Curated annotation (Swiss-Prot):
Family indicated by similarity: Belongs to the universal ribosomal protein uL14 family.
Keywords: Ribonucleoprotein, Ribosomal protein, RNA-binding, rRNA-binding
Protein's job: Binds to 23S rRNA. Forms part of two intersubunit bridges in the 70S ribosome.
InterPro entries reported in the protein's UniProt record: Ribosomal_uL14 (IPR000218), Ribosomal_uL14_arc (IPR019971), Ribosomal_uL14_CS (IPR019972), Ribosomal_uL14_sf (IPR036853)
GO MF annotation terms: large ribosomal subunit rRNA binding; structural constituent of ribosome
SMART domains: Ribosomal_L14
Gene from which the chain derives: rpl14
GO CC terms, sorted: cytosolic large ribosomal subunit
The name this protein goes by in its record: Large ribosomal subunit protein uL14
GO-annotated biological processes: translation
Parts of the chain that traverse the membrane: none
Length: 133
């Protein structure tokens, strides 16, 4: 895992946000229940942005995946963020990829585009991504 190069708004996805699962593990919808490494302020909901690892509950998917608690990395977010060259990037949906605790993807393919920041921070996600934006 490497440092992220863009100013990602970490207020994009608070705890409780629902995400599309962008891989082929059998999960379809995830809900954020915690953000790994978040050091916050009292009574403030932990927030996550692109490239952050989150702990999620599988809300929709195959019967063996449902109700499972998994680690995931956020690869797309609807809230726009700014890159160092001045461009602003935003996606159509909020999406994550289910990973193992050390950051290896559990699925073998990723549907849809992946943000460049997430692919740089998690090289194993970048290696199986079909489109990197």
């Amino acid at each position: 895992m490497k440092a992220i190069k863009a100013k990602s708004p970490h207020a994009a996805l608070p705890v409780g946000a629902r995400l599309v699962c962008a891989d082929n593990t059998g999960a379809r919808e995830l809900q954020i229940i915690a953000v790994k490494g978040y050091k916050g302020v009292r009574r403030r909901l932990p927030n996550a942005g692109i490239g952050d690892m989150v702990v999620c509950s599988v809300k929709e998917g195959t019967p063996d995946m449902r109700k499972e608690v998994v680690n995931a990395v956020i690869v797309r977010q609807r809230k726009e963020y700014r890159r160092p060259d001045g461009t602003r990037v935003k996606f159509e949906d909020n999406a994550a990829v289910i990973v193992t605790p050390d950051g290896a993807p559990r699925g073998s393919e990723i549907r849809g585009p992946v943000a460049k920041e997430a692919a740089e921070r998690w090289p194993r996600i970048g290696s199986i991504a079909s489109i990197i934006v």
